[in-house]
From Swiss-Prot:
The keyword Transmembrane helix appears for this protein: yes
Residues spanning the membrane: 232-252
GO biological process: B-1 B cell lineage commitment; cellular response to xenobiotic stimulus; defense response to bacterium; leukocyte chemotaxis involved in inflammatory response; negative regulation of dendritic cell chemotaxis; negative regulation of macrophage chemotaxis; negative regulation of monocyte chemotaxis; negative regulation of neutrophil migration
Record localization: Membrane
Name of the featured protein: SLAM family member 8
GO MF, one example: signaling receptor activity
Entry keyword Cell cycle: no
Ranges for domain Ig-like C2-type: 126-213
UniProt function note: May play a role in B-lineage commitment and/or modulation of signaling through the B-cell receptor.
Species for this entry: Mus musculus
Keywords associated with the record: Disulfide bond, Glycoprotein, Immunoglobulin domain, Membrane, Signal, Transmembrane, Transmembrane helix
PROSITE patterns: IG_LIKE
Length: 278
């Protein structure tokens, strides 16, 4: 206990040299916080602390003894090595923060190193949705305007980028929307049926990607003189229904006329029969 208080007293009263370092890692990994000191600095005592979001004692080195069994949110996830570097892990989403190691040499000189640890989530496989824009009068024939939306669920600090491949001479119009490149608008032509677009979602420590072929969502065929199956249905089905209805109407009308003629014939025969009887 006296060693701990003496180290804190050194930090408060003696000149301290501070070196700051940024460390990036991801959830589930272990990260080594390396303790570095000047050449010839022979460490006699050292103390590792978490400074933010809460100040906690993590590990100490005193008289050649390493100690890590201090009550903190890292209890059971801390290992202090002989070179005084501290390993934390497996890391959790709330482990980001500021850490410091205070070292005192055999002559009483102090050296402090602060480290900022940023823990990112691992990037999941992004989801890509394809939306087809309604055709406009000014839109060239046999082209398809699509919007590609990329999204990595349940994660922040993500940037998006796109790449495409498939047609060597692809020269369709491509525009990126939003500052993080999450939405892409693409104009496709008949020669771009096989062009595949890949969305890459990434953060500083991990990435993943998803590939789609947007022409499959355009729902039309190349205009090469052949009618598509959809176009055929649009013509054949109405004509067939019209012919069926016309046939039904003709049959009904024929039956109606036949009934009227039969009644007329019956009216003409009855008087003659009556006269013959008389």
């Amino acid at each position: 206990m006296w060693s701990l208080w003496s180290l804190l007293l050194f930090e408060a009263l003696l000149p301290v040299v501070v070196v700051s370092v940024q460390v990036l890692s991801k959830v589930g990994d272990s990260e080594l916080l390396v303790a570095e000191c000047p050449p010839g600095f022979q460490v006699r005592e050292a103390i590792w602390r978490s400074l933010w979001p809460s100040e906690e004692l993590l590990a100490t080195f005193f008289r050649g003894s390493l100690e890590t069994l201090y009550h903190s949110r890292f209890l059971g996830r801390v290992q202090l090595y002989d070179n005084l570097s501290l390993e934390l892990g497996p890391l959790k989403p709330g482990d980001s923060g500021n850490f410091s190691v205070l070292m005192v040499d055999t002559g009483g000189q102090t050296w402090t190193q602060t480290l900022y640890l940023k823990v990112y989530d691992a990037v999941p496989k992004p989801e890509v949705q394809v939306f087809t824009a309604a055709a406009e009068e000014t839109q060239p024939l046999n082209t398809c305007q699509v919007f590609l939306s990329c999204w990595a669920p349940n994660i922040s600090d993500i940037t998006y980028s796109w790449r495409w491949e498939g047609t060597v001479d692809f020269n369709g119009e491509v525009r990126s929307h939003f500052s993080n490149g999450q939405v892409l608008s693409v104009s496709l032509g008949l020669g771009d049926k096989d062009v595949a677009f890949t969305c890459i979602a990434s953060n500083p420590v991990s990435w993943d990607m998803t590939t789609v072929t947007p022409w499959e969502s355009c729902h039309h065929e190349a205009a090469s003189g052949k009618a598509s199956y959809k176009d055929v249905l649009l013509v054949v089905v109405p004509i067939t229904l019209f012919l069926i209805l016309a046939g039904l109407f003709g049959a009904w009308h024929h039956g109606l006329c036949s009934g009227k003629k039969k009644d007329a014939c019956t009216d003409g025969v009855l008087p003659e029969t009556e006269n013959a009887l008389v």
